Amino acid sequence: GDYIIEIDGDIIMHSHFIQDHISEARQGYFLVGSRSKINEKLSCRLLQEGNYQLSFLTKGVYRKFNALRLPWISSLFHSYKQNKKERGCNISFWKKDLLEVNGYDERFIGYGFEDIDLPARLRRLGIKKRFIKFKAIEYHIHHKAAATKKDMSTNEKIFNENNQKGIIKCPKGIEQYIT
């Protein structure tokens, strides 16, 4: 497809998640949504029972403000949090824009900073951020952190280097697989 919606593997999407991203997609923009979180007890129960009906009222959901779906006021927040670093757990963009920045920088090890590097390079390309608050709701399942401090330190150095040099197209990305 021409449009990519990206999530993490440890989230539960609201039933309108995909529809919300598609309805907000505009040329020249990438979209960023927020996420609510699920505590450990509720996460275990959901994974055992397989019943994923959640809302901001569900006991065990926190960051409840991020679990509110209010599409009629979402557009008021499109330019909200313009300076905040994005995360890759709830982001969408045009495939052509992803290819122009050479996708994710594969010099990153594990996770950490790779998902803020991509949107930073999209911005340097001239693609603007649109925040989709109160739409594209997702719930992050509780788990222990997997990244090591060494990986995070290495990744932070790569991210800072990309920023300092104004890198738009990363040196090791998706092109190596499609050329």
Enumerate the predicted regions with their spans.
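Short aromatic/hydrophobic "clamp" motif used to bind/position activated sugar donors
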Residues: 4
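Active-site acidic Asp-centered loop
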Residues: 7-8, 34
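Acidic metal-phosphate-binding loop of nucleotide-sugar-dependent transferases
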Residues: 10-12
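Conserved donor NDP-sugar-binding/catalytic core segment of glycosyltransferases
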Residues: 16-53
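A recurrent flexible, glycine/aromatic-enriched loop bordering the glycosyltransferase active site
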Residues: 62-93
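Conserved nucleotide-sugar donor-binding catalytic segment
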Residues: 92, 102-110
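Short, well-ordered alpha-helical scaffold segment located
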Residues: 96-100
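C-terminal catalytic/acceptor-binding lobe
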Residues: 107-179
